From Swiss-Prot:
Function: Catalyzes the NADPH-dependent reduction of a variety of substrates including aromatic and aliphatic aldehydes, quinones, ketones, dicarbonyl compounds and 17-ketosteroids. Catalyzes the NADP(+)-dependent oxidation of aromatic, alicyclic and aliphatic alcohols, and 17beta-hydroxysteroids. To a lesser extent, can also catalyze the reduction of some aldoses and ketoses and the oxidation of some sugar alcohols. In the stomach, lung and colon tissues, mediates the reduction of farnesal and geranylgeranial into farnesol and geranylgeraniol respectively.
Subcellular location: Cytoplasm
The keyword Iron is annotated on this UniProt entry: no
Catalytic activity: (2E,6E)-farnesol + NADP(+) = (2E,6E)-farnesal + NADPH + H(+)
Gene Ontology molecular function: any one: ketosteroid monooxygenase activity
InterPro entries: AKR (IPR020471), AKR1C (IPR044482), Aldo/ket_reductase_CS (IPR018170), NADP_OxRdtase_dom (IPR023210), NADP_OxRdtase_dom_sf (IPR036812)
Comment on pH dependence: Optimum pH is 10.5 for the dehydrogenase activity. Optimum pH is 6 for the reductase activity.
Free-text tissue specificity from the UniProt record: Expressed in lung, specifically in bronchiolar club cells, type II alveolar cells and epithelial cells of the duct of the bronchial gland (at protein level). Expressed in gastric parietal cells and in epithelial cells of the large intestine and colon (at protein level). Expressed in brown adipocytes (at protein level). Expressed in vascular endothelial cells (at protein level).
Organism per entry: Rattus norvegicus
Site for Lowers pKa of active site Tyr, residues: K85
Record-stated family: Belongs to the aldo/keto reductase family.
The name this protein goes by in its record: Aldo-keto reductase family 1 member C15
Pfam families for the chain: Aldo_ket_red (PF00248)
Subunit structure: Monomer.
Amino acid sequence: MDLKHSRSVKLNDGNLMPVLGFGTFASKEIPKSKAAEATKVAIDVGFRHIDAAYFYQNEEEVGQALRDKMADGTVKREDLFYTTKIWITFLRPELVRQCLERSLKKLGLDYVDLCIIHIPIAMKPGEELLPKDANGKFIFDTVDIRDTWEALEKCKDAGLSKSIGVSNFNHKQLELILNKPRLKYKPTCNQVECHPYLNQSKLLEFCKSKDIVLVAYSALGSHRDSSWVSSDSPYLLEDPVLMTIAKKHNQTPGQVALRYQLQRGVVVLAKSFNEKRIKENFQVFDFELTPEDMKTIDSLNRNFRYSQMAFALDHPDYPFLEEY
């Protein structure tokens, strides 16, 4: 599945997903109003796939932006592809729908296009996003992710989400779901960190073999939020190899990093709250990387993960100890 000439990809449930998405995560110091402004700019420049989550705590602002853009005639609801995610404190099957309904209420929407399990590591239910005990230790929960999946299938049947999928799953966790008895719907996608320093080639191959779309987050490297990312992480967009290829094509290194994913058959998310860069990030359909460029970018892989999710390292379901 080469997304070179295509603006959307058909998921295994028949629904279409735009191959280029706009990410709405913002670190704490960025005012929430920025998410609304940036989402409007993104829709104005052509983005139709909006990636959000309960955890991001800005769905009211993003939802307002969507409704404003529908009200002014820029888009209709059916033109948009909106993703939300079930947070890790809602993975008990009886809580899944509640999390999705909270998102829908904040958004002011009747349904989302895609709802995915954010991370396959359950934490203690409650209002705290990352619950800790009195000693500052994270409080884990024990949930069979297959039960969570069944609850998500019911949300699809209820019309709350058109498609369902997962995020941050390794291939063994995907197999758990694919091989479960009475599986009603396969995951349509697995959204993972993916960029030239962590190109996920084995996981991509596995997902393609199962007709699951790989969706790339942190495709431009990563935000520098110190609670998630180490301050000495390399700056992907300053990589001399990417800069050379970008110069050759008269593009930015960011555009090359996004184009690279599309040509591998990966749906790619681009996050920026800067108007100029939001525009640039959408301009990836009018140039093509050569097979040599692709090989060269492949060779940058060093299995470097910006977001280790270190808070969950001791969790029995921590996904990143597997090779893929």
